[in-house]
Amino acid sequence: MHLFINMIFLINIVFIISIIFIERRNPQTTWAWILILTFLPILGFIIYILFGQNITREKNFKRKILDDKTKQKYLNSFKSHYKLDNISLKYKDLIMMNFNNDNSTYTQRNDIDLYFDANSLFEEMIDEINKAEKFIHMEFYIFKSDEIGKKILQALTKKAKEGVEVKLLVDSIGNSIHKKDIDKLKAAGGDFKIFFPGFCKYINLRINYRNHRKILIIDSKVAFLGGFNIGDEYLGKDKNIGHWRDTHTKIKGLAINDLEGRFLLDWSYANESDLDIDLKKYFINPHSTDLPKKIIGAQIVSSGPDHTEQQIKNGYFKIINSAKKNLFIQTPYFVPDEPMLEALRLAALSGVDVKIMLPGNPDHKFMGWIANSYFESLLNAGAKIYLYEKGFLHAKTIVADSSICSVGTANMDIRSFSLNFESNIFIYNEAISKSMEEQFFKDLKVCTKVTLESFEKRSIISRIGESITRLVSPLM
C-alpha cells in the first residue's frame, strides 16, 4: 500500500514538472493543477488523466487539424465578398478578425429569426424536417430519447425512409438516445455517429473535450443554431428546474454555408473518412436568385480545442471593447479569465452600461460559487449583475449598442472558450440586436439585482465555497 501511494506521489511530481516545463499552460491553469495534484494526490492523479493532458490533446487533434485545413479548400470555393453596410462597417475590424481566425465568411443575404421558447422552436424544427427533400444534418450535444426527442427521431426516421439523406451527430457524453431508436434510424437509411466515443460513456481519455454544438441544417434552405438541446427539460417539464429560458436562431441565406461546412468537417472527423462532397448539393451559390432579399450581416464563428486561437472568446472580447453605450450579457456559467474580466471592468469604468444576467438557481452549486467570486470586482467597477429567478437561464448571448449581437452555444467561461467545440453566429444588424435587447429587458422583470450591500450579506458557507472554487476555476 505504501509503495502504491509513493508511486502516485512520484507520478504526480512528474505531472507537475510536465505542466510547468513542457506543456507551458497559462499561469492560472498551471497553479490550479499544481494545487489539485499536491493536495489531492490520488484523486488528482485520476482527474489529471481524464481532464488534464495537453499531450494527449495534441495527439487527439493532430489529424483533425490537418483534415480541417485540407477540407477547408472545398469550402473556400464558395466564399463570397460584400461591401459592408453602415452597421457592419462599424465592426470591420471584428469581421476581419473572425475571417483571419476562423475563415468565417461575412455574408449579407440572410434572414434570421430568434426563438426564446422551446415549444415554438421544436415545433418549427419538426416542421422544417418534415419538408426536407435532399438532406438533414443534425449535430447536438444533448439528445434524449424522451417525448420530444422521440418525436424528432421519428421525423428523422420517416424522412430517411423517403430517401432523404439524414446524418445525426451527437456528443458521447451528452447523448442518451436509446439503442433501439438509433437502430430504427439506421434501418431506415439514416446515418448516426458519436463524437469522441470512449471505452464506455464516462471512461474516456477525451472526456474533457466535448462537442457542445447544437446545429440543424435542412437542404441548405434553413438552419438552426443556439443554446437549446433536445430534451423534455427544455420544455419546462423537469419539476426540479421549471421554466427553461434559452435563445436560438433560425437562419436562411448564405450564412448557412459556413455552418454546413462546420458540420461536414465534424462529421468527416467522427466518421474517420475523407470529405467527398458535392458542393452544389450542400452549399448555396452566392449568385442564386432564391436568396433572401434582406440585408442582414452575419458570420458563423466556431472554436474548439483543436485550434490555438480562441475564436469565439476573441469575438466577445472585441464586442466588449467596442461597446460605447451599453453591453448586455446572458450566460448560464460565468467563469471569465483575467483578460475577459478586466475588459468587462474597463467597459463599466468607461461609462458603458454593463449588465450581466446569470441564473439565480444554478444547476451546479459550485458553478454558482465560482460566478459569485467575480461579483465584487465587477460591482465595484460599476457593472450591474442580475440573477434570473423564473426557472433556469441557459441563453448564451451578448448584445452591444443596439447594433451587434452574438447567439450560439458558447458560455462565457473558460471551458467554452478553450475546451469545448462551439459555434456562434455574430449578427451585424440593428433590428435583430434590438429584439435581443427587448428580450433582455423582459427577462429583467423576473430577476433579482445584486448590489454590493446584498452581496456582502451572503453566508459564510458561500464565502468559503467561492474562495475554494475560484482556485480551480481555470479548469472549469
From Swiss-Prot:
Q: Broadest EC class?
A: transferase
Question: Which reaction(s) are listed as its catalytic activity?
Answer: 2 a 1,2-diacyl-sn-glycero-3-phospho-(1'-sn-glycerol) = a cardiolipin + glycerol
Q: How does it sit in the membrane?
A: Multi-pass membrane protein
Keywords attached to this Swiss-Prot or TrEMBL record, sorted alphabetically, are: Cell membrane, Lipid biosynthesis, Lipid metabolism, Membrane, Phospholipid biosynthesis, Phospholipid metabolism, Repeat, Transferase, Transmembrane, Transmembrane helix
Where do the PLD phosphodiesterase domain residues begin and end?
207-234, 389-416
This chain's function reads: Catalyzes the reversible phosphatidyl group transfer from one phosphatidylglycerol molecule to another to form cardiolipin (CL) (diphosphatidylglycerol) and glycerol.
UniProt protein name: Cardiolipin synthase
User: Lineage of this protein's species?
Assistant: Bacteria, Bacillati, Bacillota, Clostridia, Eubacteriales
